[in-house]
Amino acid sequence: MGYDLPPLREPDLPRTAKVRPVALRTGWTTGACATAAAKAALTALVTGVAPAEVEIGLPAGRRVRFPVARCDRRDEGAEAVVVKDAGDDPDVTHGAELTATVGWRPVPGLALEGGPGVGTVTKPGLGLAVGGPAINDTPRRMIGEAVAEVVDLTAVGVRVVISVPRGEIMARKTTNRRLGIVGGISILGTTGIVRPFSTASWRASVVQAVQVAAAQGERTVVLCTGGRTERGARALLPELPEVCFVEVGDFTGAAVTAAVTHGLSGVAFVGMAGKLAKLAAGVLMTHYTRSKVDLSLLGAVTAEAGGTADLATAVTAANTGRHAYELWEAAGLLGPAGDLLCSRVRAVLRRFAGDAVAVDVAMVDFTGARVVASSGRWAR
C-alpha cells in the first residue's frame, strides 16, 4: 500500500448542528399525540365531559398539555383526536389526526390495538410482535401510564384502539414497507418530542434497518448514501431483496458497526465521489459540518493512477469532489482513479469493521445510473 493509512474518525455532530442558531420549533411524536388522544377519550368516557385539552407525562418526566381537536362519546365508548404538530421538522405525519377510540373490557388491564392507518408488523427485527400493530415500546408505555392516571387498571379493563385517517397514504413516503410494516404509519417516539431535522433519529433508523435485514436472515447489507446511489446499487446487485439496501446518509460508521454487531458477513458501499473521498480519509460520519472533502487526497489518487502533475494539481485545487470527478473524466482517468479511491475506502471500512465482514465498494456517476469504479468483488 503506497500511502499512509488515515486515522479512523466517527465524529459527533457539533452542538450548532443539533441546536440551530435560529431556533427551530420542536414538535410532538406520533406516540405523544396518540397518548394524549387516549387520555382525552378515556376522560370523556369516565366523566361524561369532553376535555378541551389534556396533560400527559413524557419519558423524561416533563408534563405537557395537548389541545384536543375532537372528543365525543360513542355508544359504550368514546373517541378523541389530537392533531400532530411536528414543529419545524419536515415530517410526513405533520397534521395527522391521531385518533383514540376507547371502551371497557371485561378483564382488568389495558388492551392496546392498532386501527385503520396504523401499520401492521409483518417481519421480525423491530422488537415488536409479528402480526401486531406498529406501536413502539415507549408509546405503549406512555399510553399505559396516561390511562392509569384516569382509572385503576388493576380494577377495570380498558381497550384502546389507535387509528390514523390517511395513515396508509402517509406511510408510502416512509420506509415502513421496506421494514415490513404494512397498511399504515408507525406510532413512534422515544422522548415524545420531535427535534427538527433530527440526525439522531436518522442514525437510529439506519441501525434499525440493518437490524431488520439481519433478523430476516440476510447476510449482506448494501449501504447507499441516497436515492440515486440506491438505484445504482440495485442495478449492481439485483439478486438481493429490498430489505438489504440501507440509505445511510452520513452514518456509514453506524451502519457498519450495526452490521458487525448483528453478525452479518458482508457490507457493500455504493456512493458518489464526494462521500467516497471523505470515507477514504477515514471519516465515518460524513456530515458537512464535521468533515470536508480532502482534495489533496484526491490529488494523490490522481498521481497514483498515472495522471499528469498538472492534472494532480488541478484536482487538488478543485472546488468540490464532483469537480475532481469531472476533471478525471475529462482526462480519461475516471476508471483508474475511481478504482483507487474505492480501494482506499474499502481499506478504511475493513479496518473499521475489524475484518469481521467482507467489504465491497463501488462509485456511481452523478445520476446513479452507471457504476464507474469499484473495489472488492467488482474489481476490474
From Swiss-Prot:
GO BP terms in the entry: anaerobic cobalamin biosynthetic process; methylation
Protein EC: 2.1.1.195
Single GO MF descriptor: cobalt-precorrin-5B C1-methyltransferase activity
SUPFAM superfamilies on file: CbiD-like (SSF111342)
Coiled coil (UniProt feature): none
Pathway membership: Cofactor biosynthesis; adenosylcobalamin biosynthesis; cob(II)yrinate a,c-diamide from sirohydrochlorin (anaerobic route): step 6/10
Catalytic activity annotation: Co-precorrin-5B + S-adenosyl-L-methionine = Co-precorrin-6A + S-adenosyl-L-homocysteine
Highest taxon of the lineage: Bacteria
UniProt keyword terms in alphabetical order: Cobalamin biosynthesis, Methyltransferase, S-adenosyl-L-methionine, Transferase
Record-linked PANTHER family: COBALT-PRECORRIN-5B C(1)-METHYLTRANSFERASE
Protein family: Belongs to the CbiD family.
Name of the protein in question: Cobalt-precorrin-5B C(1)-methyltransferase
Organism whose genome encodes this protein: Salinispora arenicola (strain CNS-205)
Gene: cbiD
